[in-house]
Amino acid sequence: MKFPGKRKSKHYFPVSARDPLLHQALPDSEVASSWIVGIDQTLVDIEAKVDDAFIARYGLSSGHSLVIEDDVAEALYKELEREGLITHQFAGGTIGNTMHNYSVLADDRSVLLGVMCSNVQIGGYAYRYLCNTSSRTDLNYLQGVDGAIGRCFTLIGEHGERTFAISPGMMNQLKPESIPEAVIAGASALVLTSYLVRCKAGEPMPEATMQAIAWAKKYNVPVVLTLGTKYVIGDNPQFWREFLQEHVSIVAMNEDEAEALTGLNDPLQASNMALDWVDLVLCTAGPNGLYMAGFTEEEGKRKTQHPLLPGAIPEFNQYEFSRAMRHQECQQPLRIFSHIAPYMGGPEKIMNTNGAGDGALAALLHDITANNYHRLNVPNSSKHGREYLTYSSLAQVCKYANRVSYQVLNQHSPRLTRGLPEREDSLEESYWER
């Protein structure tokens, strides 16, 4: 996808070299930069093949997910290492994945806040975390801890049955004073997950999260929340509705989380209801593709050239060619919606469903940051006659998010290894011209 942003070549989209505006653009060193910030429970996914006796020995229940104590996790990890049973160690965590994927797509800076072992052993899980994270993700603000970061063990039994053991370690020990005000002040977005505010009593992570939200509000930085799982939301949907209304500008969720939040099992209706609380909604709906919902200025609305779609809201995609705005920036807010079916019908064989939503969110964040970058560097462009949130229309953001999800579904890891090609060999030009 072509976006404004620093590139190896000197072309900026959509301005050509003959454009007089471009001559005012500053040399690279003086160009105003844009970045995003995310807070995560630093987590490593460790995959290992084990026998049934191993699972019984550690008191785990085959096929289920259990939280284990730190000493058990340490013993379990040591045995896996000693016996050479580990098949994969990946950096994980919803926000870590999103920051990494954003940096790969945008070839630009993201900042990750969280904890990291002060003492990193070469070849160990913390080392793997650092190795698996894009070099464009800034890890300089991580807070050191004397102990383990989070570990999620996926133990694959003799018959392929997966058993999960989760050890939080010290992943929730992020302190409010480790949240840098200046980094959040200059960011295009602050990205959070619902897990951050649900911790054991006495853990500082929720307080650190609220501190970050306070800085974001002070500097008018949009707060993005990804909903975690339907169980987290289903526990207390009212709490989350109020949380969204009070603190959040953009929500990302799947159809199950959307139902837990709103009580509606139609992703379109759920997205519409979520607009009562937030400015922009990204809702992935598995094999049904993805939905987006947002606001635009009544005067600036643009009609779609795509076929009008039926649904709970008839012809809901009528103005999907409009660009999204924050509700507070609209004089006469108009609700706009878009939907896209899975890219190329979805992959033939899904390698991994974990992370497709994080991939879609990274694409949306890339578009929002591109808009910010363009506003800072070409402020008198006609693109910025109004305070838009996205650079592209809702329909175009859907297309991009969809393409990135496909890429993640098609690989073993939830983290992209490379950016997307600007033009796809597999598609006729008409797909991109649409």
Residues of each region from the PLM?
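Active-site gating loops and adjacent loop-to-helix segments of metal-dependent hydrolytic enzymes
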Residues: 56-82
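Glycine/serine-rich anion-binding loops at beta->alpha junctions
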Residues: 88-101, 350-360
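Ribokinase/PfkB-type carbohydrate-kinase core domain
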Residues: 1-65, 86-90, 94, 115-347, ...
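Glycine-/proline-rich flexible loop or hinge segments
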Residues: 75-86, 106-113
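A structural signal for short, hydrophobic beta-strand segments that form beta-sheets
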Residues: 68, 349-350
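Alpha-helix C-terminal capping segments
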Residues: 99-109, 156-157, 367-369
